[in-house]
Amino acid sequence: MARGHRSQIKRERNANKDTRPSAKLSYARVSVQKACFVLDAVRGKDVQTALGILAYNPRYASTLIEKLLKSAIANAENNNGMDVSKLYIEECYAGCAPTMKRIKPRAQGRAYRILKRLSHITIVLNER
């Protein structure tokens, strides 16, 4: 069955696109569990408060998420023309990425597998 002209299909697909400003960090060298600790602290907060929380958070993931949040703010300002003072974090989540497998030699000829976990971190902003 014909679904319509190619340009019409494209138009319909673009109409359903999410226009909220966002930023995604792929293959971040931090586990999902550790990233979620930091993301839970800033979810739903306005961006200035979130930047303050991230600046004084001692976890390694907070530095990655702080840079990602600044990128999302810049996207909102430049691409969407939004006011920075009205922005807040609507969604933030971390998903699994491929795991790097490494071998650590142990006693009596054994080899233990070390899993270096990666994650994909996404932040979506919106205006209040």
From Swiss-Prot:
The protein's name: Large ribosomal subunit protein uL22
Domain of life: Bacteria
SUPFAM superfamilies recorded: Ribosomal protein L22
Annotated region described as Disordered, given as residue ranges: 1-22
Job description of the protein: This protein binds specifically to 23S rRNA; its binding is stimulated by other ribosomal proteins, e.g. L4, L17, and L20. It is important during the early stages of 50S assembly. It makes multiple contacts with different domains of the 23S rRNA in the assembled 50S subunit and ribosome.
HAMAP family, A to Z: Ribosomal_uL22_B (MF_01331_B)
Subunit composition and interactions: Part of the 50S ribosomal subunit.
Gene Ontology terms describing biological process: translation
GO cellular component: cytosolic large ribosomal subunit
InterPro entries to which the protein is assigned, alphabetical: Ribosomal_uL22, Ribosomal_uL22_bac/chlpt-type, Ribosomal_uL22_bac/org-type, Ribosomal_uL22_CS, Ribosomal_uL22_sf
CDD domains named in the record: Ribosomal_L22
Family statement drawn from the similarity comment of this UniProt entry: Belongs to the universal ribosomal protein uL22 family.
Keywords: Ribonucleoprotein, Ribosomal protein, RNA-binding, rRNA-binding
Gene: rplV
This protein's record includes keyword Protein transport: no
GO MF annotation list: rRNA binding; structural constituent of ribosome
